[in-house]
Amino acid sequence: MLGGGITVTLHRNGKVIDSNNGVGGDWPFTPERVCSCPGFQLVDLCYSGEYSKAEIKKKLMGKGGAVAFFGTNDLKEIVRRGEDGDVRAKVWMKAFVLNIAKYIASEAADVCGKVDVILLTGGGAYGRDIVSGIRKRVEFVAPVEVYPGEFELQSLAEHGYDILSGNATILSYDKNAPEPDPFV
């Protein structure tokens, strides 16, 4: 999903078998979040005495990414700046697209490249340049389909309604069931 945070998740037979940690620090850089950080420099920053624990967390998630560079998390604004000739915005967008593509392509290794389709969702999927840049870099793995917008709340509400009205059942996964072999 391409939004303020970005998750890249691999599914097999309806189950998630691998994913980046979209809230815990393992993510591509986003409009609001930094990506992988150089460890020693991060340790230095944490122990500099300049920032509290909460401030460091906010720098990593909330005030990182585009917010740190441009003071906004609005991808449309950054795209517009690039189109208007802002070199920093153009470079940031190229790096943004490349970083996401690298995360997507790395998931293919888990299934030896046997990927049926790559789905792009979220608000960022409205961006033609974002989508075309990602597609160019990952379509060698699998076809790319785009579903722009954020559907999480709608999906939860609809499925909740279906359950309450008796048109669907709550799925329960056996915690003791053997995990699928990700190397098959």
Where are these regions (language model features)?
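Active-site nucleophile and cofactor-binding loops and adjacent substrate-binding regions
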Residues: 1-3, 32-34, 146-154
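Phosphate-binding/catalytic loop of phosphoryl-transfer enzymes
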Residues: 1-27, 171-183
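A glycine- and small-aliphatic-rich helix-loop capping segment at beta-alpha/alpha-beta transitions
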Residues: 12-19, 133-142, 167
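Glycine-rich phosphate-binding loop plus the immediately following alpha-helix
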Residues: 13, 17-73
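Adenine-nucleotide phosphate-binding core of ATP-dependent small-molecule kinases
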Residues: 58, 62-113
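Glycine-rich phosphate-binding loops at beta-strand->alpha-helix junctions
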Residues: 115-135
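Conserved phosphate-binding/catalytic loops in two-lobed NTP-binding clefts
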Residues: 128, 132-158
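Structural signal for terminal/edge beta-strands and the immediately following C-terminal loop/tail
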Residues: 148-184
